[in-house]
Amino acid sequence: MESQKEARTLQEPVARPSGASSSQTPNDKERREGGAVPAAAALGAEADDDSADGLWELPVEPAERRPECTRCSRPQKVCLCPFLPAHPLHISTHLYIIQHPAEENKVLRTVPLLAACLPQDKCKVKIGRRFSEERDPELSTVCRKSGTLILYPGAEAANLEEFILDSPVYPSTIIIIDGTWSQAKDIFYKNSLFRHPKQVQLKTSISSQYVIRMQPTNRCLSTLECAAVALSILEKNNYIQETLLRPLQALCSFQLQHGAQIRLSKEHLLKNGLYPKPMPKNKRKLRKMELLMNSVKI
């Protein structure tokens, strides 16, 4: 069959008009198999191609970013500064945010709001995936201090509230990783520097108010919420948590008023048969989904 087709093709060559597209519609193909293409059709195809080629020559203007507020990093039309404290909160704890590079340019990120509420010398953001003593000697020094904690859940993590009651050295610094859960896991386990600080976690039953972004489970909190709870515990001041959550609440409220939808956790969607995507074939990912459905901490 293939040889017959090749022979027929060689015996009946079809001339393509200059400038015609190499792609063929079904009608083009039928006309070509029946004989020569009519002159009017050929001219029409050539004219269409010429006009399409002209579109590629039109100048393209780069999209302009909306002017951003220098304090909250939000577009000026939706500035959240009215919901920020008039002056940075007075805290004694140093906060280090280890931010995955993919989070840096996300529109609805929470770290700029957090940084806008705190003194610059108390809140530092380090962007990257790999850190070492050579690359970041400051962070290396911080990680080796006895008063430094790193907030990351796990079997070896102590509950923050219980830890500070028995700790001989009261914590002076806390490190929080900013990124998706898979990104945070990658940063935590692939940087040996983060083995030095005491690992702690939050023992809280509150649900995330960051409802415009899907979380893996009902117990997961955004970076801003984690910092708000942790700082209120370390500073023994609940007003800190209330103040830090105010701009986050305003952000979510504004987005919901302008078309955003409440994003339920993946755990909730799976348990209620609402998860829109097919279950993964990868055994490791499938096992993770099963743990979420059974409310097992992962």
UniProtKB/Swiss-Prot annotation:
Q: Where is the stretch described as Disordered?
A: 1-53
Q: Which residues form a coiled coil?
A: none
> What segments bear the compositional bias annotation Low complexity?
35-45
Keywords for this entry?
Acetylation, Cytoplasm, Nucleus, Phosphoprotein, S-adenosyl-L-methionine, Transferase, tRNA processing
Q: Which family does it belong to?
A: Belongs to the TDD superfamily. DTWD2 family.
What function does this protein fulfil? Catalyzes the formation of 3-(3-amino-3-carboxypropyl)uridine (acp3U) at position 20a in the D-loop of several cytoplasmic tRNAs (acp3U(20a)). Also has a weak activity to form acp3U at position 20 in the D-loop of tRNAs (acp3U(20)). Involved in glycoRNA biosynthesis by mediating formation of acp3U, which acts as an attachment site for N-glycans on tRNAs. GlycoRNAs consist of RNAs modified with secretory N-glycans that are presented on the cell surface.
A GO molecular function term, named singly, is: tRNA-uridine aminocarboxypropyltransferase activity
Phosphoserine-modified residues are S132
In which residues does the motif DXTW occur?
178-181
What's the protein called, per UniProt? tRNA-uridine aminocarboxypropyltransferase 2
Substrates-to-products reaction catalysed = a uridine in tRNA + S-adenosyl-L-methionine = a 3-[(3S)-3-amino-3-carboxypropyl]uridine in tRNA + S-methyl-5'-thioadenosine + H(+)
User: What's the name of its gene?
Assistant: DTWD2
Q: Which GO terms describe its biological process?
A: RNA glycosylation; tRNA modification
Q: Which organism is it from?
A: Homo sapiens (Human)
Q: Does the keyword Coiled coil apply?
A: no
Positions where N-acetylmethionine occurs in the chain: M1
- Note whether Glycosyltransferase occurs among the keywords: no
One cellular component (GO) term of this entry: cytoplasm
Q: Return the EC number.
A: 2.5.1.25
